[in-house]
From Swiss-Prot:
Phylogenetic classification of the source organism: Bacteria, Pseudomonadati, Pseudomonadota, Betaproteobacteria, Burkholderiales
Pfam family, one: FA_synthesis
Catalytic reactions on record: a fatty acyl-[ACP] + phosphate = an acyl phosphate + holo-[ACP]
Biological source species: Verminephrobacter eiseniae (strain EF01-2)
NCBIfam families, alphabetized: plsX
Name listed for the protein in its UniProt record: Phosphate acyltransferase
Highest taxon, organism lineage: Bacteria
Similarity comment: Belongs to the PlsX family.
UniProt-listed GO biological process terms: fatty acid biosynthetic process; phospholipid biosynthetic process
């Protein structure tokens, strides 16, 4: 039985969405159990043989600062959910709440794995091959060293290996060109480290990739710093929304366009399904001594259920042990990233 701790109060919609998603998830996973964390009055109506309520008196708001969430709201549903993972009561925690707060609390309670300086946020973006490309970091670390990028690649490889069937996942380093001589000094150094890791058998490094390769599906994993990754994520979400919105407008302009829309409906439906972010919801916070997954803050029930699915698959396939094993194997290359003091938590806008 795999147990997940769910922050039922987080996100833009709170229990109205999270509880509906939890019920659907339990219906689809007979070997799963949920710990529903939140304010008792809001969760009391939910009953299920494989669900238990865990009381939390406070809620981390989407606009709460990291300091407020970490130091003043010590009985928040987000914190109590992550505490279940620390205590061994749950295999993973899932929240749609404030990303900066989630990362700060998770890092404070769970700590980072040996050999990892900073956790990273990893999620999937749809690609032209009908699958998805895993991208990290998506906002946890705005400034990264070459060693950080190597650590992200190692953790990303473990994630994809755990969640997808197939051979060793391919890794690409996001750059302004495919040539090794291009990019900043940090990117060039990261490329050298990734090539060394590939020679040692720690990674399947493809080489440098460009932004369009994320959506071509040229590689399974794209590694970048959190600033670039977050910009790429938000740009792709905005582009997808613009395309879908433009199609709706154009097909409703006049009667002939509406007739064309009826004929093209199956194709349009398939296109919209492939571009629907809800199918890829659920970002992993990698590098911690416990599994934590972040749902999009505006997720509906379908999207939040997908985040639960991701956490369930990660726990079932022993993601944490896989990350530890890869880190141990790559330990000679994972030297201390830099001599700079670690920031408490980088500001992030990933929701």
């Amino acid at each position: 039985m795999i147990t997940l701790a769910v922050d039922c109060m987080g996100g833009d919609h709170g229990p109205r969405v999270t509880l509906a998603a939890c019920r659907a998830f339990l219906d689809h996973h007979p070997d799963a159990r949920l710990l529903l964390v939140g304010q008792t009055d809001s969760l009391r109506s939910f009953t299920h043989a494989r669900a238990a309520l865990v009381a939390a008196t406070e809620v981390v708001a989407m606009d709460d600062s990291v300091e407020v969430a970490l130091r003043k709201k010590k009985d928040s549903s987000m914190r109590v959910a992550i505490q279940q993972v620390k205590d061994g009561a749950a295999s993973a925690a899932v929240s749609a709440g404030n990303t900066g707060a989630l990362m700060a609390i998770a890092r404070y309670l769970l700590k980072t794995l040996d050999g990892i300086d900073r956790p990273a946020i990893a999620t999937q973006l749809p690609n032209a091959r009908g699958g998805a490309t895993t991208v990290l970091d998506l906002g946890a670390n705005v400034d990264c060293s070459a060693e950080h990028l190597l650590q992200f690649a190692v953790m990303g490889s473990a994630l994809v290996s755990a969640l997808q069937e197939g051979g060793e996942p391919t890794v690409g380093l996001l750059n302004i060109g495919q040539e090794a001589i291009k990019g900043s000094e940090i990117i060039k150094r990261a490329g050298e480290l990734l090539r060394s890791a590939a020679q040692c058998g720690d990674l399947n490094f493809h080489g440098n990739v460009e932004g369009d390769d994320i959506f071509k599906g040229s590689v399974d994993i794209v590694v970048c710093d959190g600033f670039v990754g977050n910009v790429a994520l938000k740009a792709s979400e905005g582009l997808a929304a613009m395309i879908i919105g433009a199609l709706k407008i154009e097909f409703s302009r006049h009667v002939f366009a509406k007739m064309a829309a009826i004929v093209a409906y199956p194709v349009l439906q398939a296109l919209m399904k492939r571009m629907d972010y809800r199918r890829y919801n659920g970002a992993a916070l990698l590098g911690l001594r416990g599994l934590v997954f972040k749902s999009h803050g505006s997720a509906d029930a379908m999207a939040f259920e997908q985040a639960l699915n991701r956490a369930y698959d990660a726990a079932r396939n022993n993601l944490l042990d896989r990350v530890r094993a890869r880190i141990a194997h790559a330990a000679p290359l994972l030297a201390p990233a830099d001599a700079q003091p670690k920031p408490d938590i980088a500001a992030t806008t990933h929701r």
